Amino acid sequence: MSADVTEGSDRCPSGVYLKCWYNSLTLARSVDGGRTFGQPPAPRHLIAAVPYRYQPDVGPVGLFQPSNVVRRSDDGHWYALVHAQAFGAQREGTCVMRTADLRDPGSWRAWDGSAYRVRFANPYESSGTGGRICAPVSFAEIAGMTHSLTYNTYLDEYVLVGPSSRPGHGRRGVVHGFYYSTSDDLIDWTPRKLIREVTLPTSFECGDPNPAYFPSLLDPDSPSRNFETTGQRPYLYFTRYHFKDCHSTLNRDLVRVRVRFSR
């Protein structure tokens, strides 16, 4: 991921970081087991971007929060989810993208509503939106969830986990927390269900419990090198923040909790 922000300059007259956030997806490769990463020279490192050039004080704009990458055994492609912010012709939600060659950043194609035909382009090298806008999937069911994607061998389905919210029952207001959804094709998802109710950084109000974020399902017993699979009893990992005087600090904990799926 990349974000070009210069606060308080002519690139961001307001000096407000979020309003001047433009995000795209880029390729980084490691040849030493993840110790270090390198990128092809720009712009050949670009994987995906919205077909609009940067504009100050209209953000955040772009493609955000990519999931981990999983390989489907039935077609040999590698898949990932990405959150698209609403801007121009781009609708907000979760987009699905795939490639047959992880080494080629230009080989990724996104779902357009009926097939994987969206070919991302560098907005500084070309113009127009035709064939360059991804179609969000199952918005009512998963909203913009993308954080953690695994194939669950117990459920025999893909499992998506992410921070979200839903209206509560009875007199309860909105319920914030970590939710999950399942799918057999990465396009059609079940209505998200609550795993763990937590305060989110985006919903925090002074006096609330310390928030948590970045949920991921990981299974230490996964045979996948990149933990692409989970079983019946994986761990839910997440980051717990420690706020001070109602403001975020860099004091954060990595927490894990065992969860159990049932059919």
Model-derived features: positions:
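Beta-propeller and closely related beta-sheet repeat lectin domains
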Residues: 65-68, 145-148, 205, 210-225
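Short linear interaction motifs
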Residues: 60-63
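Beta-rich carbohydrate-recognition and catalytic domains
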Residues: 1-57, 73-142, 151-206, 222-263
